[in-house]
From Swiss-Prot:
Heterotrimer of UreA (gamma), UreB (beta) and UreC (alpha) subunits. Three heterotrimers associate to form the active enzyme. It comes from Escherichia coli. CDD domains: Urease_gamma. One of its GO terms (biological process) is urea catabolic process. Coiled coil: none annotated. It is found in: Cytoplasm. Its main location: cytoplasm. One of its GO terms (cellular component) is cytoplasm. Belongs to the urease gamma subunit family. This is Urease subunit gamma. GO terms for molecular function: nickel cation binding; urease activity. Pathway: Nitrogen metabolism; urea degradation; CO(2) and NH(3) from urea (urease route): step 1/1. Induction: The probable operon is induced by urea.
Amino acid sequence: MELTPREKDKLLLFTAGLVAERRLARGLKLNYPEAVALISCAIMEGARDGKTVAQLMSEGRTLLTAEQVMEGVPEMIKDIQVECTFPDGTKLVSIHDPIV
């Protein structure tokens, strides 16, 4: 299988998002990379499902709470930016203060 560097990055992010999702389901608190991966993965999948940038920006703030992540993680993540493929092209989705 031949993948472009961008496709490899997306695959790595998706894999990290799955790991984070499973750890969260087991009741573990997520660390910084896991929290970013989970939110980013959900945003990419939402774009694939046909949601708008505005919907994804709004939903991105509701995916995790401070109780679901390790201490200090919400303060470390001020912005998450994900480049997503939409039916009308590639767009950058920015989520400000994603964990409240």
